[in-house]
């Protein structure tokens, strides 16, 4: 009786392995089909969208037309004596520093 039961359990386990293999293949196929549907939907959405370059150009135009709120607007030097610190000397002979 043991020989018969061990033989039938061996066949049963063989069927389980085949079923699990089938199930894995079906699950993988279902996942791939779902991914394909997702990509098709995404492609349809992209086809309906405007070109990015047109949107970027419009955005850049709006940004360029407005001054930066964090930078002060100056029309010229407020105090002309400050310019001496940012400009080089007018004559090389007057310069006493070794850098310039």
UniProtKB/Swiss-Prot annotation:
Keywords of the record: Acetylation, Cell membrane, Coiled coil, Lipoprotein, Membrane, Methylation, Palmitate, Prenylation, Transducer
Keyword Coiled coil part of the UniProt annotation: yes
Lipid moiety-binding region (S-palmitoyl cysteine): 95
Residue span, G protein gamma domain: 21-100
Propeptide: 98-100
Main location: membrane
Region of interest (Regulates lipidation and cell membrane subcellular localization), residue spans: 90-96
Function of the molecule: Guanine nucleotide-binding proteins (G proteins) are involved as a modulator or transducer in various transmembrane signaling systems. The beta and gamma chains are required for the GTPase activity, for replacement of GDP by GTP, and for G protein-effector interaction. Involved in the abscisic acid (ABA) and ethylene signaling pathways. Regulates basipetal transport of auxin (IAA) in roots and hypocotyls, and thus modulates root architecture (e.g. lateral root formation).
PANTHER family given in the database record: GUANINE NUCLEOTIDE-BINDING PROTEIN SUBUNIT GAMMA 1
Protein name, UniProt field: Guanine nucleotide-binding protein subunit gamma 2
